[in-house]
Structure formats: C-alpha cells, structure tokens
C-alpha cells in the first residue's frame, strides 16, 4: 500500500500495517508530531522494477506536472496527497497521481482511492470511486 500522507495518528498507521500489505508512506501536514519524526517527507519505492515517488504536498497547481517531471526524472510515477482531489494524468514520461481520499473528500466530487497495477515494468492506474 502506498500512502501520500495524512495518516493523522500513529494508531491509524499501526492499524493499516496490521490488516493489510506492507505500507509505504510519507508524512502529511495533518500528521501528529510522532509521525512527522518517523516518516519521510518524500521517498521513492520500487515495485517490480518501476520507481514510484511518494510525497504529500506537490506544490501549487500551476505547472505542477512539469515541476514533478523535472524533479523525478528517474521515476515512472509520482503519488501525492494533500489536495484530496483525484488526479490520474500522464505528463511526458511520468504518471502524476493523486488517489483523492476515501474518507475526507473536501472539494473533490467523490470519495476515491487509486489502484496501481504494475506488470512487466508498466504501470496501469485505476481510479476507484467509493
């Protein structure tokens, strides 16, 4: 499981780790101090040879995709959180992905999550409406 931050509490992160697959995540702005001390602000994970960057806040909307493509030249995808607005977009070499939120949609039209299938070095993203 890849998580773009805002676990909010150590307890929730521990619950995720107890019930599911391994959790790879980054801290978010709403996370309690203990999480901010233990989780990185960004990280790159590799799944079947595919490099995926994780970060919470991808910066302002204007030119976001171009900034991320330049920053993560060696990655095939970036998964970010913070906005709670789903995004599945291909920009140059990079998938720019935001799963939205299964719990707090804020300005997004729906609750959502993202399923990434990685096979033979290729990513197939699927936005799932909840």
Language model regions located:
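Active-site environment of divalent metal-dependent phosphoester hydrolases
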Residues: 8-12, 30-36, 59-64, 79-90, ...
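Core catalytic region of metal-dependent phosphoesterases/phosphodiesterases
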Residues: 1-47
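Residue-level detector of structured alpha->beta connecting loops
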Residues: 20, 74-76, 93
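Glycine/small-residue-rich loop that forms an oxyanion/phosphate-binding "nest" at active or ligand-binding sites
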Residues: 27-30, 36-54, 59-73
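A generic structural micro-environment signature
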Residues: 13-14, 32, 51-53, 61, ...
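Active-site neighborhood of phospho(di)ester-bond hydrolases with catalytic His/Asp-centered motifs
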Residues: 1-6, 24-29, 53-56, 77-82, ...
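Binuclear metal-dependent phosphoesterase catalytic core
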Residues: 39, 47-48, 70-74, 90, ...
């Amino acid at each position: 499981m890849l998580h773009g931050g805002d676990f909010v509490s150590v307890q929730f992160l521990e619950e995720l780790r107890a019930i599911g697959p391994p959790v790879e995540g980054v801290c978010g702005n709403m996370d309690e101090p203990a999480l901010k001390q233990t989780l990185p602000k960004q990280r790159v994970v590799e799944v079947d040879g595919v490099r995926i960057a994780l970060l919470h806040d991808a910066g302002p909307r204007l030119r976001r995709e171009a900034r991320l493509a330049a920053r993560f030249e060696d990655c095939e995808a970036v998964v970010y959180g913070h906005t709670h607005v789903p995004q599945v977009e291909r920009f140059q070499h990079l998938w720019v992905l935001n799963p939205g939120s299964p719990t707090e949609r804020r300005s997004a039209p729906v609750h959502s999550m993202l399923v990434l299938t990685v096979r033979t070095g290729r990513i197939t993203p699927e936005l799932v409406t909840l």
